[in-house]
């Protein structure tokens, strides 16, 4: 669970992938490029949350790499804390990453919760569209705990 797992957000495809380092971010982006290879124009709504101490800039560069016909938009969210049994794990504040995303000319917002970000993502009714939750296995855990019903 939590690795290249397809779900649905209403009628919108939703991909869960815990991609939490540069290598897994590159693998996720390559997978998405393959999935969208025959789609001339598509939107990816990213819902991302990161642990403190991660190489976020490298992960963002891998995930948000420009491609003709592909439009990115990002919601940054924290994951729930404390992480059960791991009090040393801390979520990076979403505001700590906004400038890095915006420096890549990508629309970026922050939300206080995964639920709020999913509501925002579901309101997007443009071209072919997918939603991807990534950046932390703890964020994927939040999805299963709070929103899978």
Features from the language model and the residues they span:
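Structural beta-sheet core signal
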Residues: 46-48, 76, 133
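Surface-exposed, flexible loop/turn segments at secondary-structure boundaries
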Residues: 52-54, 82, 116, 139
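Active-site-proximal loop/hinge segments that shape catalytic or ion-binding/gating pockets
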Residues: 136
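Nucleotide phosphate-binding/pyrophosphate-handling subdomain across enzymes
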Residues: 1-72
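C-terminal helical cap/extension that packs against the catalytic core
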Residues: 13-14, 62-130
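Active-site-adjacent alpha-helix immediately C-terminal to a catalytic or transition-state-stabilizing loop
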Residues: 141-149
């Amino acid at each position: 669970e939590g690795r290249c797992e397809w779900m649905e957000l209403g009628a919108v495809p939703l991909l869960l992938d815990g991609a939490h380092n540069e290598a897994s971010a590159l693998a996720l982006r390559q997978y998405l490029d393959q999935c969208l290879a025959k789609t001339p124009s598509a939107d990816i709504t990213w819902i991302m949350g990161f642990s403190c101490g991660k190489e976020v800039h490298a992960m963002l560069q891998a995930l948000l790499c420009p491609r003709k016909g592909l439009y990115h938009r990002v919601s940054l969210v924290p994951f729930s804390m404390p992480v059960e049994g791991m009090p040393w794990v801390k979520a990076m504040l979403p505001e700590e990453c906004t400038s890095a995303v915006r420096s890549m000319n990508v629309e970026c917002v922050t939300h206080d919760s995964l639920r709020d970000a999913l509501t925002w993502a579901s309101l997007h009714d443009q071209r072919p569209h997918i939603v991807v939750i990534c950046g932390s296995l703890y964020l994927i855990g939040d999805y299963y705990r709070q929103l899978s019903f």
